[in-house]
Amino acid sequence: MNLRGLFQDFNPSKFLIYACLLLFSVLLALRLDGIIQWSYWAVFAPIWLWKLMVIVGASVGTGVWARNPQYRAEGETCVEFKAMLIAVGIHLLLLMFEVLVCDRIERGSHFWLLVFMPLFFVSPVSVAACVWGFRHDRSLELEILCSVNILQFIFIALRLDKIIHWPWLVVCVPLWILMSFLCLVVLYYIVWSVLFLRSMDVIAEQRRTHITMALSWMTIVVPLLTFEILLVHKLDGHNAFSCIPIFVPLWLSLITLMATTFGQKGGNHWWFGIRKDFCQFLLEIFPFLREYGNISYDLHHEDSEETEETPVPEPPKIAPMFRKKARVVITQSPGKYVLPPPKLNIEMPD
């Protein structure tokens, strides 16, 4: 494994999001099971940390942009800065939704439709952001997730306010449609991995990449679908599981997503105004890391080089010895005997 290349492709933004979601889901499961008695404002602490990092990073990036006009003429700089502003706007709407959720749980004084109102605004904004991202070749996973779930948000709000009395299995129909699409993606990667394994014209690196993608998608989608099914059955009263066993598949998916961030290129360079890859930024701040991080080992290659460089000792040379009777020649390699060729009699013509 090439650790240097692995960290060069590290995406710190996604890692922060998945880590905060993992910690939040652990605290939420413990709170729902009554193991901890914290306030929900404390349970949402990882979410507040996530949004705080977004706001601070965008503020610093905007300050660097304003103080350095020369940066605006650099290639994709304007596109990346606009993408950061779009992401900040969506995160602020999500922050408003999360604050309303905590207030509704703690005090219970207003309708869930009002709580979900920021999400109803997020969806059309996310659709516009996706159109802009496709035109400028930008990857916008969060925006796509918010845009395709507008119907799911409406159903959940209506069900929580008891305006509709459908079972949760029916309420989550838009979610099942989305998960069916993800299952097709998993099947697609599995089929292509099998085809690449059976093909002799594909190099080993491509086979390894497709197998890794297939395993990653399986480890993400299958546990996530399991979590959703268990949660819906619990809400409908079909099982009496505690929340921790239900959340375990979700934790597995989030851990896998965290692992995949080490092989994903991308990330906006304008967060905190660093304007470069995160690992390169760290190496410039902490130069001593270069001594330990910029080293690669190849034991097999080193062994082969040592074998090539080490001269092979030659066997001692022994003078040839001839014996007339046996007509045996002892060559320079002791112990190896070669019979001489038979005599040829060439008769000269008269």
From Swiss-Prot:
It comes from the Eukaryota. Coiled coil: none annotated. The chain crosses the membrane at residues 16-36, 41-61, 81-101, 111-131, 177-197, 211-231, 240-260. The keyword Translocase does not apply. It is found in: Cell projection, Dendrite; Membrane. Broadly expressed in brain where it is specifically expressed by neurons (at protein level). Also detected in some cells of arterioles, intestine, lung and testis (at protein level). It is a multi-pass membrane protein. Keywords: Cell projection, Membrane, Transmembrane, Transmembrane helix. It holds the Pfam family Tmemb_185A. GO terms for cellular component: dendrite; membrane. Induction: Up-regulated by erythropoietin (at protein level). Residues 298-350 are annotated as: Mediates interaction with MAP1B. InterPro entries: TM_Fragile-X-F-assoc. Belongs to the TMEM185 family. PANTHER family: FAM11A, B PROTEIN (PTHR13568), TRANSMEMBRANE PROTEIN 185A (PTHR13568:SF2). Interacts with MAP1B. This is Transmembrane protein 185A. It comes from Mus musculus. The gene is Tmem185a.
